[in-house]
Amino acid sequence: METSAYAIDVRGVTKKFGARTVVNDIAMQVRPGEIYGFLGPNGSGKTTFLRMLCGLLKPDAGSGQCLGLDFRRESAEIKKRVGYMTQKFSFYEDLTIEENLDFIARLYSMTQRKAAVEKSLERLGMIERRTQLAGTLSGGWKQRLALAACLIHEPQLLLLDEPTAGVDPKARRDFWEEIHKLAASGLTFLITTHYMDEASRCNRLAYIAYGNLLASGTVAEVVKAGGLTTWEISGEHLAALAEKIRGLPGVEQVVVFGTTLHVSGRDAEKFNASLSPFMANGQRWTKIESGLEDVFISLMETAKDNFT
């Protein structure tokens, strides 16, 4: 088998739990050193896909490579080269930062544990907090500890499952700065997230719903492929206007964005014909470029729920 040039190069990945298909025929290619975003609603199959990639869960179908290794037959070797950060903080809260990292180094049977722990502490700016109990850390510092633990064995690929969920905006920004620094050094990332601003920080991204891959590419490519026409409406009586236009021919979504409405549709002819009678009601109508959130809401609303 020829070694793939991609860090992740898989196709046809499928997983079923009973009669339910939770990951359906997914293909993905992620380049070395790339930050690849994986988006989708809760229960869409993101975590299941990550767990199959790193060998924690056996796929029912699919083929391909992860870090040049057959992702189905060589999962034990893949685990040694991958760092996996789970959604839930899973470290010992009654141990210090340093003790937690030393414990992880022991699990990997590292011969130079002390040096590895020191490097992780320094890399994530935790030298001065090394003796602090993990249970007393803020959400942002807990995420730093989790990232440090993922890095301690010098992996080539990091799988981060909603790493900034529940973290304040500044901590999220700092966390992403660390990710970009690490990616610049050649580390590859596959990151699940719900946040549109985080999706925009990724080199490329994919969107999954109900186990099906609905879109992939750069932000610009995904937005263009969405094919949406979007109007931003500001002014008075927006709630009443929203009720009147919701459900009209060509109108796919009516969403409140702060003090404005975003109204979108794919069939431009039907869409504009339905909205024309309302454009002289005193509100301000501005045609804008559709954003990721507009596209993803549209994808979600048109996706078939095969989980029910």
Where is each model-derived feature located?
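Helix-to-loop junction immediately C-terminal to a conserved catalytic motif
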Residues: 54
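Conserved ABC transporter NBD signature motif
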Residues: 62-70, 77-78
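Conserved ABC ATPase signature
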Residues: 94, 133-137
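Conserved ABC ATPase "signature" region
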Residues: 102, 106-129
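Catalytic Walker B motif of ABC-type/P-loop ATPase nucleotide-binding domains
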Residues: 158-161
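ABC transporter nucleotide-binding domain
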Residues: 177-266
